[in-house]
C-alpha cells in the first residue's frame, strides 16, 4: 500500500490486533499518527462504495461528529487520524453516554449527503437444511446444534424477508455497536464507518439502542439505557418512527447473514489468505447458533422496550 501522502514514518507501522477480519495498523509520521485499515476483500459480503462512504465521513467530521478525521479512502485501504480512547466493556453503557449516542445519530441523519448507489437487499439465506447435512458430513463440532435449529433459522429467514419496513430511510452509519465506539473523557467517539449507507431509521435506532443497553446475551438488557438513546435522538431534533418489529429486523438480518457466511467458511476446502482464523470463525458460528434463536424468540419482549 502506498502511504507516502502521510509523511515520513518515525518508526515501523505496527499491527493493532482485534476480532475484525480487516487488518488495522498504526502509523506514526512527522505529520501525526494515523489508523491504516487494509480491507479484506475475501470477507466482503456486500459492495463497498468507497467514494460515497468517504464523502459521508467528511461531511460528518466537518459537522462536528466525534469521530476520527477521515484522511483518504480507496476500495482497499482506509486512513484516519488516530484517536485515543477507552474500549467499551461488554455491559450497558451509562445513561448519559447512551443519550449522547442518540444525539449523534440525530446529527448524522440531519446531514445532507448525496448517496449515488442504490441499496439492494438480497433475500435471506434458506439453505439451512443443506448446510446442516454438509456440517454433519464434514464433522463440524456444532453440526448437531445447527440441525436442531434448522426450522428456527428458516423461520428467521421468513421474518427477515416479510417484515414490513415502513421507513423513513436515512443515510447512516449502520454499525454503531460497542466495539465501534470509544469512550474519551466519558463521551462517545464513533469508529468504523465503512458499512455506512441508506437504512430504515427504525432499524438503525433499534440496533444501536439495543447494543449499548445490554451485556452478553439477552438476559441483561437495561430499558432505561435503551430509552436514553431514543431520548437523545428526540432532544437533538429527531423524530421516532412507529414501533414494531422493524426496529430489530436489521440486527437479526445482519446476524443471520454473518452466521451463514461463517458456516460456509468453516466448510470451505481452502481458507482465505486473510481475515479471521478458523478458530475465531468457529466461535462466531457458535455465537450465532446460540444467540439468534434466543433473540428471535424474544422479539415481543424487545418490542416492549419501545413502549
Which ranges hold each PLM region?
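Juxta-kinase regulatory segment immediately upstream of eukaryotic protein kinase catalytic domains
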Residues: 1-13
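ATP-binding pocket architecture of kinase catalytic cores
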Residues: 28-117
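A glycine-centered beta->alpha junction motif in the catalytic cores
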Residues: 41-42, 79-91, 133-139, 256-275
